[in-house]
Design a protein with these regions (language model features):
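Positively charged n-region of N-terminal signal peptides that target proteins for export
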Residues: 1-4
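Short loop->beta-strand "edge-of-pocket" segments that line small-molecule binding or catalytic clefts
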Residues: 29-37, 42, 126-143
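Hydrophobic/proline-rich hinge and linker segments of small-molecule sensing/allosteric domains
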Residues: 101-124, 212-216
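Pocket-lining segment of extracytoplasmic ligand-binding domains
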Residues: 120-121, 131-229
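Bacterial N-terminal signal peptides
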Residues: 8-19
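An extracytoplasmic/periplasmic, membrane-proximal ligand-sensing/linker region
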Residues: 27-33, 37-48, 215-283
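Extracytoplasmic small-molecule ligand-binding "clamshell" domains
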Residues: 25-90
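Short helices/loops that flank or line small-molecule/ion binding pockets
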Residues: 70-83, 96-97, 126, 167-182, ...
Length: 283
């Protein structure tokens, strides 16, 4: 049986805004981001970027973050988000939402891992049989779908628990509430460097392009083009580069550089979702 730990249930979506918009301005468009870090860090990272893009593109954007991965998945499926920085539009059940990829972070090949603390006596995946393993949430590609796929294909049965986001899962592992965790390798690495966490990798996936910049088909083409241009040129603009550096410092990660991308760049992720034995839980 699955159970959730680490964050309280939230009755409403968490809205993290990029600042008060004047009443005369157009209604801001929702910028959806899959939550991987704490809500505070998510806001500290994205708010400066969206403020810059809004000013440069003339398109007001508002950060909209669901408290859990499955709720984000449901928002994507219902087409509630105008723009996405996510991979939940590649889930087979969400393909009909019609989001169109227009960019991605440069060098954004990432992997999933199953890890234990460095001093753990567990050395092999098979030793996890029957044990509790924490994951971010049931909609996490790198942190749940890939690790659970690896366990299921090896006929290793674990008792999954869910922390709500990547850092919540790391905290469960760090405090000894579970013996192992399935995680985004890059988020874990950044957290470990920031918090001095020593861990050991039991299994790692192949690299995947992880997150895409996408637009809902209801967004006018000229609006998408304006936002796309602002993002893709951001790193080459001194002011934009400074904003990216400040955002990166908040999460102790290298600054993002956005580059063009297309839907076919993520075909391997779509293939995974069409063949995995992992049940994709949707709301």
């Amino acid at each position: 049986m699955r159970r959730w730990v680490g964050i309280p249930a939230l009755a409403t979506l968490l809205l993290l805004t990029i600042g008060t918009l004047a009443w005369s301005q157009p209604r801001p468009l929702a910028w959806g981001v899959i939550i991987g870090r704490s809500p505070t860090l998510t806001a500290q990272f994205w708010n400066p970027i969206l403020r810059y893009v809004s000013e440069r593109s003339g398109v007001p954007l508002q950060l909209k973050v669901a408290p859990t991965g499955p709720e984000h998945t449901a928002m994507v499926r219902r087409g509630e988000l105008h723009f996405l920085y996510s991979n939940h539009n590649f889930i087979k059940e969400n393909e009909k939402s019609g989001y169109r990829v227009f960019g991605r972070p440069k060098g954004d090949t990432q992997s999933g891992e199953i890890v234990v603390l460095k001093d753990s006596p567990i050395r092999e995946l098979s030793e996890l049989e029957g044990k509790e393993v924490v994951f971010p949430h049931t909609a996490a590609f790198l942190g749940y779908h890939l690790p659970m796929d690896a366990l299921m294909r090896r006929n290793i049965h674990v008792r999954p628990i869910f922390a709500g986001n990547q850092e919540g899962a790391i905290t469960q592992l760090k405090t000894g509430r579970t013996v192992a965790a399935g995680l985004n390798a890059e988020v874990l690495k950044a957290y470990a460097e920031r918090e001095h966490l020593a861990y050991r990798v039991l299994w790692g996936s192949e690299k995947y392009l992880n997150l895409a910049l996408s637009a809902h088909p209801s967004v006018p083409a000229d609006t998408v083009a304006a936002v796309r241009t602002a993002l893709l040129e951001m790193a080459d603009d001194p002011e934009g580069a400074k904003v990216l550096a400040v955002a990166a410092e908040a999460v102790k990660a290298p600054p993002l550089v956005f580059i063009p991308a297309k839907d076919s760049d993520f075909d391997n992720m779509r293939r995974f979702y069409r063949t995995t034995p992992v049940k994709i839980e949707l709301q």
